[in-house]
UniProtKB/Swiss-Prot annotation:
Membrane topology: Peripheral membrane protein
InterPro entries: EF-hand-dom_pair, EF_Hand_1_Ca_BS, EF_hand_dom, EH_dom, End3
Subunit architecture: Component of the PAN1 actin cytoskeleton-regulatory complex.
Family label: Belongs to the END3 family.
Protein name per Swiss-Prot or TrEMBL: Actin cytoskeleton-regulatory complex protein end3
Species of the source: Neosartorya fischeri (strain ATCC 1020 / DSM 3700 / CBS 544.65 / FGSC A1164 / JCM 1740 / NRRL 181 / WB 181)
Statement: the UniProt record of this protein carries the keyword Kinase: no
Annotated EH domain residues: 10-100, 139-227
Disordered: region residues: 306-327
Coiled-coil features, chain-numbered ranges: 281-404
Taxonomic lineage of the native organism: Eukaryota, Fungi, Dikarya, Ascomycota, Pezizomycotina
Keyword Membrane applies: yes
Gene Ontology CC terms: actin cortical patch; endosome membrane; plasma membrane
Superkingdom assignment: Eukaryota
One GO BP: endocytosis
Amino acid sequence: MSNKKIEQWEIERYWEIFSSLANGHPRLNSSQAASVLRNSRLSDDQLEKVWDLADVDGDGELDFEEFCVAMRLVFDLVNGELQAVPRVLPDWLVPETKAHLVQAGRALSDRPEQFERIEDEDDTPGLKDGFDWYMKPSDKSKYEEIYSANRNHRGEITFESLQGLYDSLDVPDTDIRSAWNLVNPSASLAINKDATLAFLHILNYRHEGFRIPRTIPASLRASFENNKIDYQIDNARPAQRWGADGDRETPTGRKAKFGDTYLSRLGVGGKGSYTPKGTDFSDTIQDEEWEKVRLRRELSELQAKLDAANKASEGRRDRPRNDGRPNWTLIKKEALQLLEYKERELRELREGTGRAKAGQDLERLREDIRTVGEQVEGLKSHLAQRKEVLADLRSQIEEERARR
């Protein structure tokens, strides 16, 4: 199984883009998403395939989970993690809430897995008769714990989801598949809860040394479709009710009880609990991130060209470098310096330092100069008024002197 996943920091960045494009709506249409997807400079054919993969529910729009899938596919293509758009969506990219849609789509394109029916022509020696369809309350509780720990979003169980249980049992693979075929006559990809409980009940008895029944009662088979299996003890025939004791020890006395080891490993059946985990989209890329990605892509292309040039120049390294050919080492160095310069500019813009800070200081200085200029004009006006008053006083003094 792949260890890849969409990290939380990616989800947060994708949310910033999604929320800015969606304007409060829960989905993006193709026009809204095109503005950011086309910045990747992928071809329209590639972007069309990415859209078709990400639009899991096929409604022609992308909700946030589907948008995260599309963005991750685009970044993997740009960064060279993917050489081409995959034909089907990788399992690790499938949103947990839409897994059933992907499974249904695959079921329509592929035939469901059907196991060969194993007919027990000669009974396995050492097995006992007396299989009882009645489920004791303690057994039923254990079956329900196993079911709850492995069910999908539709409340169904697939054959592969119980592989850990099969490994803990003393039951041959052929018998396990025979039991599955018995409770799954339609050869579906998954079975519902009632069929699962019956399947686990058969495995329990086989684990305890009882033969697997060859048929299922008609009423019980019908109840798999109606979800109404009758577990009432009063409805069971006395001969069947006491046909076997589910609490008896196993023949070896050392074999673990059915499902105990498996439930212990899952952390259920006691104080623990088990909850399947997938990518959590409940919790959020800026345009400059595309520039970083493009620069890294150009750098990788330059690196590839450099490697090709080095291979072509093997045996001629001592030749003087005056033939006009490009200096790939210098080109790589300049590309790295350009990347560092762009990242430093982005950092200064975010932090308000460097040239961004100098620009802010210059603006403040201009504002101060404007303020001082206004104050000077005010002082000049005040000085002119005082000069007029002084001239008037001098005129009055001269008139007094003339009178005397």
